[in-house]
Every structure is written in C-alpha cells, then in structure tokens.
C-alpha cells in the first residue's frame, strides 16, 4: 500500500468540470440554478451521469428501491465502508452546488487515492 503524501492533491479542474456537467442537467436558463426534482427525468439523468463516473472508477455500485445510489471503493479489510456524500436532486430553484459538491467531492477523493495507488484500510463510499 502506498503511504499518504503531502503532495496528494485533488484535481480541482476535474471536480469543477463534473460540477458543471451535473449542473447542466435541469439548468434554469438565465440563472446559475437548476431544477432536478426527485423522481423526475432530470433526476434520473443526473443519477445516470454520477453512476457513469462511478463505473469509470470501478466502484461497486448499488441502487436501492427508491433510487439512492452508493458507489464503494474496496479497502484492504472487510467491514462497513467510511461514507461520504449528499444528494444530487434539488428543490424547484436549487443552486448548482446544492448537494452536488458533497457527492462529487467524495468521488474526487476516491479518484485521487486511486491515481496515487493508495488503497484505504476500510472501503470508501
């Protein structure tokens, strides 16, 4: 296992690009807001996009009966993963970062660890 380094940094451009891509789904024209209400076509499109990024990271993906998506990076040891996250659905006039940053920051951490060859002790979700 690689060790943590003070040189370990997230890719802010990749994170910003993902935030922008997700914010386009349900974007409210003329504003920086978006409307991606739960259980709408926009919500499904947003979840599908996030799932595609999880697949690119080879995460183990589960979707429950109401559409909650969890992607897990395996750790060195079995047991419950350390979880981070939020939501990607919005209220009718939600902001582009509302919930999205909490989900995408977790993916960025996983991608950064993978790129550095670091496998965590516990899984990350």
Regions found by a protein language model. Give the residues of each.
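N-terminal capping segment at the start of a domain
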Residues: 2-40
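Generic secondary-structure signature for well-ordered alpha-helical cores
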Residues: 3, 20-27, 55-59, 112-119
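General structural feature for long, well-ordered alpha-helical segments within catalytic domains
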Residues: 11-18, 42, 46-50, 109, ...
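N-terminal glycine-rich anion-binding loops that anchor highly charged ligand groups
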Residues: 17-30, 46, 73, 78-82
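A non-catalytic alpha/beta surface segment that caps or lines the substrate-entry region
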Residues: 28-73
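Short coil/turn segments at secondary-structure boundaries
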Residues: 38-41, 91-101
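Catalytic-core environment of secreted peptidases
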Residues: 57, 65, 69-97, 106
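Alpha-helical metal-binding/catalytic segments enriched in His/Glu/Asp
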Residues: 84, 96-125
């Amino acid at each position: 296992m690689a060790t943590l380094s003070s040189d370990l940094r997230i890719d802010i451009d990749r994170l910003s690009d993902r935030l922008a891509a997700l914010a386009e789904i349900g974007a409210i024209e003329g504003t920086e807001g978006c409307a991606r209400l739960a259980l709408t076509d926009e919500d499904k499109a947003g979840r599908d996009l996030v799932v595609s990024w999880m697949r690119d990271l080879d995460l183990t993906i589960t979707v429950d009966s109401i559409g909650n998506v969890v992607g897990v990076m395996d750790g060195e040891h079995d047991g419950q993963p350390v979880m981070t996250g939020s939501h990607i659905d919005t209220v009718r006039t939600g902001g582009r970062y509302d919930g999205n940053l909490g989900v995408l920051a977790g993916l960025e951490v996983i991608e950064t660890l993978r790129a550095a060859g670091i496998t965590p002790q516990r899984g990350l979700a």
